[in-house]
């Protein structure tokens, strides 16, 4: 009975993203072949496109906390595209338009889900398995001079960074996993919205969610893995389901067992 309900829900849920997958079966594959001959310069150029930046630099991981602290001291706010409990979409576009200096930390959700610099963030920070030990710091077109100088002071030349032999496949796998988890979360959210014991569900991909309009205009290719909900018998107490990339039926069955 449960599998029938999951299939009915998943059939009605649209999926968006750069991954070809069978969510119910838990399988996924990246679209296109993995380029194993990439250079660090290629990686940087890719993130410029993903985030809508003007340029990007590689910064050693050991310097990232110091860089962010300096930016915050200068008036910047570090935000994540998805944050809070219940989960909501950060209004990067609106806050930037209102004059906030924003640094979008995309290391958790993945830069492929948010074109933060295009939306108005001054910087976007991302991780990539192809360049371990570094973060990719993307700068908005016409970046504020002192912000750009702070980044350049910590940056390394991409020409001096070597892409690891297995990095391209690891990164492709990580992106496929994130997209599969996002698509699974969409099914789980729809399932919980119909659950007799659940009173409230928050997921940016649900049309009834307060963040839905913002999510559809500011996120790309999916709505993330986080689904927050409240049991009817425990009003006011939020719980979180973090979707994975495995068979969504198994995820729901495990949820029911634990719930």
PLM feature spans:
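Conserved PLP-enzyme active-site core in the AAT-like
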Residues: 1-196, 202, 208, 258
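PLP-dependent enzyme catalytic core of the Aspartate aminotransferase-like
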Residues: 1-8, 58, 232-259
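Conserved small-domain helix->loop->beta segment predominantly found in fold-type I
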Residues: 170, 178, 186-247
């Amino acid at each position: 009975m449960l599998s029938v309900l999951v299939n009915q829900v998943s059939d009605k849920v649209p999926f968006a993203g750069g991954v070809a997958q069978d969510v119910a079966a838990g399988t996924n594959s990246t679209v296109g072949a993995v380029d194993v001959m990439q250079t660090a310069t290629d990686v940087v150029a890719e993130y410029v496109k993903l985030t809508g930046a003007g340029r990007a630099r590689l910064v050693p991981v050991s310097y990232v906390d110091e860089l962010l602290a300096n930016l915050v001291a200068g008036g910047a706010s570090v935000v994540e595209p998805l944050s809070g409990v219940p989960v909501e979409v950060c209004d990067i576009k609106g806050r930037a338009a209102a004059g906030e200096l924003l640094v979008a930390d995309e290391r958790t959700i993945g830069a492929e889900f948010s074109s933060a610099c295009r939306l108005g963030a001054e910087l976007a920070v991302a991780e990539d398995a192809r360049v371990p030990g570094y973060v990719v710091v993307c700068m908005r077109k016409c970046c504020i001079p002192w912000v750009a100088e702070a980044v350049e002071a910590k940056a390394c030349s991409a020409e001096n960074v070597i892409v690891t032999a297995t990095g391209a496949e690891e990164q492709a796998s990580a992106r496929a996993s994130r997209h599969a988890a996002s698509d699974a979360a969409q099914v789980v959210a729809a399932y919980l919205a119909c659950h007799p014991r659940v009173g409230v569900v928050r997921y940016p991909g649900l049309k009834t969610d307060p963040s839905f309009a913002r999510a559809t205009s500011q996120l790309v290719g999916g709505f993330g893995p986080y689904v927050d909900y409240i049991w009817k018998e425990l009003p006011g107490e939020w719980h979180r389901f973090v979707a994975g990339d495995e068979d969504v039926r198994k995820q729901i069955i495990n949820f029911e067992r634990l719930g």
